[in-house]
Amino acid sequence: MQVQLTNRQQHILWATVRHYIATAEPVGSKALIEEYDLGVSSATIRNVMGVLEKSGLLYQPHTSAGRVPSDSGYRIYVDKLITPSEVLAKEVESALQQRLQWEDWSLEILLQGAAQILASLSGCISLITMPQTNTATVRHLQLMQIEAGRIMLILVTDNYETHSKLMDLPPGRSEKPDPEVIDRELQIVSNFLNSHLRGRSLLEITTLDWSQLDREFQLYGEFLKTSVAGLANRTAAPAATQIMVRGVAEVLRQPEFSQLQQVQTIIQLLEEEQEQLWRLIFEEPELEDTNKSKVTVRIGAENPLEPIRTCSLISSTYRRGAVPLGSVGSSRPSRLDYENAIAVVAAAADYLSEAFS
């Protein structure tokens, strides 16, 4: 339960957090008097800051120092005292539209580019997960003869990801087949598969009733059932380690990362323990309004992963319609520009949702 604050207390908390974010220095009443028009005396500010400290929203890192926000102070600041920057949100959308070439680039390169843009605009470590293939649908299936007795099954999803599987021809022929006959048969089967499966999700393929295929293609029926379903199952397995990460070097130069050991644990999480991070930022939102992305802000100790318990993690899910595909995230020490970071993440998630629609 959040502390109930008066308007004056909210205003002074807002000014304290804002000044600390900008300077990384403990904040005293003198600094607030000089920078903000609070309409009260220095003594009143000191008294209010004392109340905020007793409420657990501020604390003194040293006895003689000013005050800095606690996780609880940041939480009220984020939930009650700020509004995400609409100007920066439009700048993000414009940058993504102008700099990304959806027709010419691979999906991985596109998301790497998007992550770099977000890192530049937010000043945070940017994180973008690859789309989950278990939510993808079939764009095209093709069976091709590679050599005598060997064929390849190629699956292209609507995310433009390509997956393939090499297989032997199904048994059951009384004589060695003519390669041209096999090519014609494979094209007929490919056309049949596309007419039945195009637009279906990979999960639907694995539970599809193949009896109709069995009746029309007795020779290929069981073979197709195991081959296509097997490839779809393999493709649909969540790839929990696929995260595009950018902006690490700049963030690690922040004063909060002055200890080498802390830097090492952050880098280890980003490079070697991405599955833990993926499970934290990828969540299926419960949204009534699917036109805009919900943003989750985890501050400091709200993060369950030890390496980022002094950081804030801002994330939002991008999707196709109501189906979650992946997530956009930003992270840096809890002393960050939340108005900008939240706006950047929300705008990027909305852009990707529209792009994948």
Curated annotation (Swiss-Prot):
One of its GO terms (biological process) is negative regulation of DNA-templated transcription. One of its GO terms (molecular function) is DNA binding. InterPro entries: GAF-like_dom_sf (IPR029016), HrcA (IPR002571), HrcA_C (IPR021153), WH-like_DNA-bd_sf (IPR036388), WH_DNA-bd_sf (IPR036390), WHTH_transcript_rep_HrcA_IDD (IPR023120). The keyword Repressor applies. Keywords: Repressor, Stress response, Transcription, Transcription regulation. The keyword Amino-acid biosynthesis does not apply. Belongs to the HrcA family. Negative regulator of class I heat shock genes (grpE-dnaK-dnaJ and groELS operons). Prevents heat-shock induction of these operons. This is Heat-inducible transcription repressor HrcA. The gene is hrcA.
